[in-house]
Amino acid sequence: MWTALVLVWISSVLLPRSHMMSAEPRNIVTNKWPKAVNQSMLRDTVPRTDNTFTERTAIVPPAPVTLTTETWAATLNSTRVTAEVTTHGTNTSTPTTREGTTDRVTSRTLAVPTSSGPSSAEQTRPTTIAGLPSLSTPHAEVPRTNASVSPRTAMAATVAPHTATLAAGTVNTSDPHTRTPSPAKSTPTDTSSKNPIPTSGAQIQGTTVQLTTDQPVHSTAGRSALSPSNATLEPTTTQVQTKEPSASTVPARATSLSPDVDVISPTTQPSPTLPTQGTGGPGTLLTTEQVGTKTTSGTASAGPTSRSSGDIKVPTTDSCQPSTQGQYLVTIDALTPSLVNKMLLLVVLLVGVTLFIAVLVMFALQAYESYKKKDYTQVDYLINGMYADSEM
């Protein structure tokens, strides 16, 4: 009983102290306090259960001193561990963080041992402060990491001008590209005007091409008459026609000139309107020539159809008539199978209905016979059999 009372009194004395220590800020090892108390209590009480009550009372006062020293040693160890963890964290995080964050981390770790405690713990504080230079060394390493960060920022700064020079390079390259299209566009037009010369394969066409290259500059700039425009457009039509039909004869070319003049005549009407919009630029002349060649290519594609028919207006009506006749024929072909299918369906329906009626009649006859024979007995069946045999 006395031992139990002593233990209760010791626990009642030590528990308020533990609560007071837990109320202080940055007391990380408050959970370890009861464990240390229990261990110290077991060490002090278990071997001395046989002693007298006076010895137990003498044991009580030194117990808190030993507990405080042990707990503060535990707290120092905990602070060192946390400081090491934080320094490792700063070493890993310094490449991305700033100096202010590392200073804050070190200040937090240094603020841990400054917590208030008993006098026995104050004697141990100078040892902890003397031991904290190990903590200050990572703080000395922090500017190194910052210094290592600064060359990276310098590298980033050096990269920035590279990017700026690249952007300038792109701008400079884009400027010549924007400047070059005008000669680039002019050169393909010249090549397009020169390409038909070897493809024509005739000396007469070569002379006509020279006339076209010389005439549009003078005729479109100064002359607005339709006769030179017709003269210039005729050889272009011959060139396009020589490109499309690979194996075309010379008389066919001669015959193609007469219908093509009628087809190109509407194209000559918009040609004088174009120089009225812009007469002072050679670029407009090139565009008019390109449009003329495109229109003649379209007319040339229509040219072979006119040759096959012979006339210009009649083939259009002929081409429309066969299409309509074909449509009528297709509709007639579509109607005849539909009628045949309807007749077949009707025949199948009639045959099916007749078979169904025949089956119903057969079932009705069998039902009627069975209805007559419902009152027959075995003797009747024998008599009927005898009569049947006699009849046979």
From Swiss-Prot:
Transmembrane segments: 343-363
Glycosylation sites: N77, N172
One Pfam family per UniProt: DUF5585
One GO CC term on file: plasma membrane
Bilayer disposition of the protein: Single-pass type I membrane protein
Polar residues composition-biased segments: 107-127, 170-249
Region (Disordered): 83-154, 167-320
Biased composition (Low complexity): 86-97, 265-277, 284-309
Extracellular side: 24-342
Principal location: membrane
Keywords: Cell membrane, Glycoprotein, Golgi apparatus, Membrane, Signal, Transmembrane, Transmembrane helix
The protein's name: Uncharacterized protein C11orf24 homolog
Species the sequence originates in: Mus musculus
